[in-house]
């Protein structure tokens, strides 16, 4: 009995010692919190794509291009959305890579243990991207308008720094800036197709063929022009080149957008 008691006592002491050693080890975030964080990111992913990336500009420009060509529902919305997503992935790849290296890698390595630090690290590359687009297009008025409505003094913009602009003010200002840039590019896309419409309409009137719908005549010429100039590569390439990057001068971006 004494031997059995000693054995049980030794086992209890060993278990207690093991528990003490385990409690002394640093603990990171629990698996439950990691799963909750992952589900939150997945849920907010569509909103993040819409609000903080170049998706808005690309999708709006492609939609305006479809209207300018007068092709109705061709290409289908699924095609334009898919093309916009793929172009967004190409443009946002450097920014996403920064987020991964500066936030995800330290978080997985245990160097970041609280969500506030993780958020601060992850949002900085996105903030740099959004500020770069606003600066390249010169659409600071949208940012000042949002900040003014939030009660922030913008009477002297020279005193403001990027640190004074939070995400609540930056995101809507960025979206308004992207919409303005998209409409500017859409206007430039409309011009050649508008010329074709005017020429064809004038020819039909001069030939007393006013009963013939101009769309039946202009659409083949629009498609021919678009194919001859390799329109898809030209439009998508210009779209991806219109976003400010570290290796692209602001003057070149402004020329693509039509601000030069």
Q: What kind of feature is each model-predicted range?
A:
Residues 2-260:
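Hydrophobic alpha-helical segments and their helix-loop boundaries in membrane
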């Amino acid at each position: 009995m004494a031997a059995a008691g000693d054995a049980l006592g030794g086992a209890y002491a060993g278990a207690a010692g093991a528990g003490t050693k385990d409690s002394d080890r640093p603990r990171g975030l629990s698996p439950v919190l990691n799963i909750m964080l992952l589900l939150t990111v997945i849920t907010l992913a569509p909103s993040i794509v819409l609000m903080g990336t170049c998706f808005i500009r690309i999708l709006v420009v492609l939609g305006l291009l479809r209207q300018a060509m007068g092709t109705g529902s061709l290409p289908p919305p699924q095609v334009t959305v898919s093309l916009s997503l793929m172009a967004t992935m190409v443009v946002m790849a450097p920014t996403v890579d920064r987020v991964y290296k500066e936030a995800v890698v330290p978080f997985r390595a245990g160097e970041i243990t609280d969500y506030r630090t993780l958020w601060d690290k992850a949002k900085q590359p996105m903030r740099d991207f959004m500020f770069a687009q606003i600066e390249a297009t010169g659409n600071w008025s949208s940012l000042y308008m949002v900040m003014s409505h939030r009660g922030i003094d913008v009477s002297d913009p020279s005193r403001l720094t990027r640190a004074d602009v939070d995400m609540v003010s930056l995101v809507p200002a960025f979206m308004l800036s992207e919409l303005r840039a998209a409409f500017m590019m859409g206007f430039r896309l409309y011009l050649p197709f508008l010329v074709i419409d005017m020429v064809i309409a004038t020819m039909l009137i001069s030939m007393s063929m006013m009963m013939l719908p101009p769309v039946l005549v202009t659409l083949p010429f629009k498609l021919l022009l678009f194919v001859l100039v390799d329109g898809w590569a030209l439009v998508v390439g210009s779209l991806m080149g219109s976003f400010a990057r570290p290796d692209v001068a602001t003057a070149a971006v402004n020329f693509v957008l039509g601000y030069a």
